[in-house]
């Protein structure tokens, strides 16, 4: 916890004010309450990712009383059978819907988080999800399927320009958004390093939760050095109008090749900085 306290203090120097606690399922961590206290909800917005299985009225009130700000509940489909099959857990859909009610009762902010695969944005099921979110006044946050991790080898899941264009069209009509949605008068851009950084349990900093490559370890180096390193990387520093891990096939190949090479040595990810991002060019100074 001392490492997280130092991270919280370092984040203040950068004006970082949000921490999203994810997993696995973070609610299974017996030290979650201590972690929330350490990250300091009086200074930072504490957001919780959950599949909803354990997020009932009691847990929602507990999180709100701890100073929690928002809960993001994952829902893969409005069709209960499809959602439960994907989660490999009968009843998962019902538990997710219960979680939304619990969060609302506790006065928490909410998001419905869902993944878009190719062509889903044109389906009746997706229309039903947008209607549900509108009726319940829940913002719909969408992530594009990435050909990495469990999606590796499933290039057919990756959204095309046609999908992305339709999504942008719907953003103007519904309360739906992605990390690429224009905001505060700025056009949508990839937010690696600039708007998001992922910290794992060992202190490794990844520039995106969908990347398995590290920029450095915050328990061994200052956060400022790691973020500066990321901003100077040719893939991560410059602003891009694409999701680099979801749309840029040159980077996707580089990423997956390095992950495969590292996995031949050890099953433990992420790929260390020296074996991955350090091998790419820097932004010209």
Language model features by range: what are they?
Residues 66, 74-76, 81-194, 201-202, ...:
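Radical SAM enzyme [4Fe-4S]-AdoMet core and its adjacent flexible, acidic
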Residues 21, 48, 73, 203, ...:
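Conserved, mostly hydrophobic/aromatic
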Residues 209-285:
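Flexible mid-to-C-terminal extensions adjoining Fe-S/redox cofactors in radical SAM and related proteins
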Residues 1-69:
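Conserved alpha-helical substructure of the radical SAM core
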Residues 29, 58, 81-82, 86, ...:
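Residues that scaffold the ATP/ADP-binding catalytic core of kinase and kinase-like folds
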Residues 28, 56, 92, 118-122, ...:
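Alpha-helix N-cap/loop-to-helix initiation residues
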Residues 22, 49-51, 113, 274-277:
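Structural motif
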């Amino acid at each position: 916890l001392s490492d997280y306290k130092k991270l919280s203090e370092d984040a203040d120097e950068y004006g970082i004010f949000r921490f999203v606690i994810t997993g696995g399922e973070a609610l299974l961590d017996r030290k979650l309450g201590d972690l929330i206290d350490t990250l300091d909800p009086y200074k930072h917005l504490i957001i919780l990712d959950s599949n909803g299985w354990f997020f009932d009225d009691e847990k929602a009130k507990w999180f709100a009383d701890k100073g929690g700000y928002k809960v993001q509940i994952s829902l893969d489909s409005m069709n209960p059978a499809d959602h439960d099959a994907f989660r490999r857990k009968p009843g998962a859909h019902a538990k997710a819907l219960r979680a939304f009610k619990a969060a609302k009762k506790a006065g928490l902010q909410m998001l419905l988080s869902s993944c878009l695969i190719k062509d889903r944005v044109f389906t009746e099921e997706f229309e039903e999800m947008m209607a549900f979110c509108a009726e319940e006044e829940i913002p719909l946050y969408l992530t594009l399927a990435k050909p990495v991790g469990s999606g590796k080898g499933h290039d057919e899941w990756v959204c095309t320009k046609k999908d992305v264009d339709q999504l942008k069209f719907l953003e103007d009509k519904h309360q739906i958004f992605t990390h690429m949605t224009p905001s505060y008068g700025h056009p949508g851009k990839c937010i690696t390093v600039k708007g998001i950084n992922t910290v794992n349990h060992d202190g490794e900093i990844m520039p995106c939760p969908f990347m398995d490559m590290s920029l450095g370890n915050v328990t061994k180096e200052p956060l400022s050095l790691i973020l500066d390193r990321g901003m100077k990387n040719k893939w991560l520093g410059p602003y891009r109008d694409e999701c680099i891990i979801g749309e840029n096939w040159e980077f996707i190949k580089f990423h997956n090749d390095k992950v495969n090479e590292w996995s031949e040595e050890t099953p433990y990810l992420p790929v260390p900085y020296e074996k991955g991002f350090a091998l790419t060019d820097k932004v010209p100074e």
